[in-house]
């Protein structure tokens, strides 16, 4: 029998604020929504951000800053990054509590309406301190907000038209309704998701394999395990590899049958009568990155719970981006430890994974904590980018050739365009 995680916030079904049509908006005040917030509003509308029915009210916003949670029916539910809608001071002045406003895309199309709860000023220093845990602002996460000229926030409830996804990998993106239906259809007794914003090298890939095998050992005698490579394909910082290229690498990895090759425990899977390659699916999640470390790890878990996933993998430096001087904002495993400190309810279970590397003595990837004293094969991130950028194939013990080839083609095209 399928086991699907309950919707966050105590709801029986994911929030659904998608409508077929909108009333006339010609006379309504307008809120221009940038591409990033457009995506967030659609994730609210499709239930990925349940129990929200719109951008956060001031009461919810303040609750997240103070308690790392939102209250529903007298109960606190885990939530670590406030999600109100940024607006300009001029837009805020035109909004009235209890009345609708039109949501307008950057291209000028009205895509939804917001019934206003209230507009309020945006205390960015307080926001940054609560989310990132530091008053320093020399890091990518802080710049997301400090570079935004908007000074106010608004909360309320939304109704939006369905988004017409046009990217080439649109069939590989799953939303709460479709993912939950898939989990039930496949009869997964447990499921595990791995979050990434990067192309995978084998140590990354092993985190997914490890999480799947840990779950398999726990429930594999009685339950079929669903395994999901669940990358974010929303807005990222400029030096991250674009979503289309990353998705191509993931497709090569999974459709090519390379997942876990040489690193998985073949005997374990065989003994449970299950198959990692057949049970692993690629499911993109169209949501932005906040580069928020531990705070974002909790949000990532909430997204997956709303998708219906039962277990979520948390590795080292989850959602991490250091200070500009390369010093660390958070400890390597702070994103794992935050789940032990949450006061709000969160039903999805986490699977913690430590450092992994290819070990010469083993002939495959394993956990560093279990293989102390053995010889690792590794390439630094900067060296890896340098090799791929120059068209040099990295060591296959570090990155699979199918993944590397996609990236080398990407950098070659990028370099050619830059010199044209």
UniProtKB/Swiss-Prot annotation:
<keyword id="KW-0486">Methionine biosynthesis</keyword>
<dbReference type="GO" id="GO:0005524">
    <property type="term" value="F:ATP binding"/>
</dbReference>
<comment type="similarity">
    <text>Belongs to the sulfate adenylyltransferase family.</text>
</comment>
<keyword id="KW-0548">Nucleotidyltransferase</keyword>
<dbReference type="InterPro" id="IPR014729">
    <property type="entry name" value="Rossmann-like_a/b/a_fold"/>
</dbReference>
<dbReference type="GO" id="GO:0070814">
    <property type="term" value="P:hydrogen sulfide biosynthetic process"/>
</dbReference>
<dbReference type="InterPro" id="IPR024951">
    <property type="entry name" value="Sulfurylase_cat_dom"/>
</dbReference>
<keyword id="KW-0547">Nucleotide-binding</keyword>
<dbReference type="Pfam" id="PF01747">
    <property type="entry name" value="ATP-sulfurylase"/>
</dbReference>
<dbReference type="GO" id="GO:0019344">
    <property type="term" value="P:cysteine biosynthetic process"/>
</dbReference>
<protein>
    <recommendedName>
        <fullName>Sulfate adenylyltransferase</fullName>
        <ecNumber>2.7.7.4</ecNumber>
    </recommendedName>
</protein>
<keyword id="KW-0028">Amino-acid biosynthesis</keyword>
<keyword id="KW-0808">Transferase</keyword>
<keyword id="KW-0460">Magnesium</keyword>
<dbReference type="GO" id="GO:0009086">
    <property type="term" value="P:methionine biosynthetic process"/>
</dbReference>
<dbReference type="GO" id="GO:0000103">
    <property type="term" value="P:sulfate assimilation"/>
</dbReference>
<feature type="modified residue" description="N-acetylalanine">
    <location>
        <position position="2"/>
    </location>
</feature>
<dbReference type="InterPro" id="IPR025980">
    <property type="entry name" value="ATP-Sase_PUA-like_dom"/>
</dbReference>
<comment type="pathway">
    <text>Sulfur metabolism; hydrogen sulfide biosynthesis; sulfite from sulfate: step 1/3.</text>
</comment>
<keyword id="KW-0067">ATP-binding</keyword>
<dbReference type="InterPro" id="IPR002650">
    <property type="entry name" value="Sulphate_adenylyltransferase"/>
</dbReference>
<keyword id="KW-0198">Cysteine biosynthesis</keyword>
<dbReference type="GO" id="GO:0004781">
    <property type="term" value="F:sulfate adenylyltransferase (ATP) activity"/>
</dbReference>
<dbReference type="Pfam" id="PF14306">
    <property type="entry name" value="PUA_2"/>
</dbReference>
<dbReference type="InterPro" id="IPR015947">
    <property type="entry name" value="PUA-like_sf"/>
</dbReference>
<keyword id="KW-0007">Acetylation</keyword>
